[in-house]
């Protein structure tokens, strides 16, 4: 059974016209979870990764085990006000407004090679902000890995200049 077969698709969620890709069925399946993590770790294995970064909340689900598989640490990227201590912040545009993400100021040392992991690549706005945050903190983005990519939304276009992989593609 493929990884795609282990992802539940729920139509009209969270609102009419949206085809929601539900990873809970994938991560509940031991083989599916292991295969996902193994494939992402394989993508990064020869990239001399120093640390894995993942945005909340579902980036944590895949980011932590990928970091474990690579033998490196994990750094969370959170919404403003969720991390204690000094942070570095980046703002980015949403369809209707702005949002922001933060990382601890001392989490990434200059020159660190960073793997970015998330569950889904859609429009690319959030993950482009994560990459900018990593670079603002002094890190070098060594690659980006996603469990799912919604190819019609052309998120890769916002990630030009980075090496990107996804495990499962959907038109939308």
Swiss-Prot record:
Looking up InterPro entries in the UniProt record yields:
Ade_phspho_trans, Adenine_PRTase, PRibTrfase_dom, PRTase-like
Q: What is its EC number?
A: 2.4.2.7
**Which EC class is this protein assigned?**
transferase
Q: Which GO terms describe its molecular function?
A: adenine phosphoribosyltransferase activity
Give the catalysed reaction(s), semicolon-separated: AMP + diphosphate = 5-phospho-alpha-D-ribose 1-diphosphate + adenine
Q: How does it assemble?
A: Homodimer.
Q: Which family does it belong to?
A: Belongs to the purine/pyrimidine phosphoribosyltransferase family.
Could you identify this protein by its name? Answer: Adenine phosphoribosyltransferase
What is the originating organism of this protein?
Answer: Clostridium perfringens (strain 13 / Type A)
Q: What is the lineage of its organism?
A: Bacteria, Bacillati, Bacillota, Clostridia, Eubacteriales
